[in-house]
Regions:
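Hydrophobic alpha-helical
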Residues: 58, 78-155
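Flexible loop/hinge segments that line or gate small-molecule binding clefts
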Residues: 1-20, 31, 38, 44, ...
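Loop/turn elements at helix/coil->beta-strand transitions in domains of secreted/extracellular proteins
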Residues: 9-10, 34-38, 65-72, 113-118, ...
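Short, solvent-exposed amphipathic alpha-helices that sit
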Residues: 21-25, 49-71, 82-87, 101, ...
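Extracellular/periplasmic ligand-binding modules, especially the Venus flytrap/periplasmic-binding
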Residues: 122-131, 157, 167-185
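Hinge/cleft segment of the Venus flytrap/periplasmic-binding protein
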Residues: 50, 61-72, 171-196
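Soluble non-cytosolic domains of exported or imported proteins
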Residues: 16-20, 49-53, 96-100, 121-125, ...
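Short beta-strand->loop
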Residues: 15, 40-50, 75-78
Length: 196
């Protein structure tokens, strides 16, 4: 359900097609940017299959289709310590890594890449990082990302977000329940159930 596994006993995988949806997100962001400029990616982590699939598909689509768009940075939220140490070295600051906040890391990335025109956020947490930066630093990149919650809907209505990939959690749960029942009854299942 939602995230694949290499466990051999899985009878069905129920999820959004993360590759196709990230490809569409790349197309939408490129369109909003006029098919040129610098992009930063904000990924929820560097390890989960969902994040890797979304990142790889997004990057592949941008690199293969939009020669005038450059991906200048990919921020993985689970690698914040690496970014903190990079900041300390590059900025020659006396701060310790433990004293640097995630907000300061995001500020640093936008200062390092002042010409960023677009941002891709792989989930709602990553989206919040970009939206918070917009509020703090008065930057206004084009933004396309995943997941809908109250904050992202409000930002979309206000024109702060240019596109959202919205999954179907009800459909995922329903399809997973049906697939589980079919597995319990020794009935066949599709190997992959795309919930849109």
């Amino acid at each position: 359900f939602d995230s694949s596994s290499d466990y051999p006993g899985i009878s069905a995988f129920v999820s959004t097609d993360n590759s196709a949806s990230a490809t569409e997100a790349a197309n939408r962001l490129a369109e909003a940017m006029g098919e040129s400029g610098e992009v930063m990616l904000f990924m929820q982590d560097s390890k989960s299959q969902v994040a890797q699939t979304r990142e790889n598909a997004f990057v592949s689509q941008i690199q293969s289709t939009y020669p005038n768009i450059t991906i200048v940075e990919t921020y993985h939220m689970d690698q914040i310590d690496t970014y903190k140490n990079q900041m300390i070295q590059e900025l020659a600051t006396d701060k310790q890594a433990a004293d640097i906040t995630e907000e300061e890391v995001i500020d640093y990335l936008f200062e390092k890449h002042p010409n960023v025109k677009g941002c891709f956020a792989s989930n709602s947490d990553a989206m919040e990082l970009v939206l918070d930066e917009m509020e703090r630093k008065n930057v206004s990149p084009f933004i396309v990302g995943y997941d809908m919650n109250d904050d992202s809907m409000e930002a979309l209505k206000a024109g702060k977000i240019d596109g959202l990939v919205v999954q179907n959690p009800f459909g995922m749960g329903y399809a997973a329940t049906i697939a589980s029942a079919r597995a319990a009854l020794n009935m066949g299942n599709e190997a992959f159930v795309n919930t849109g």
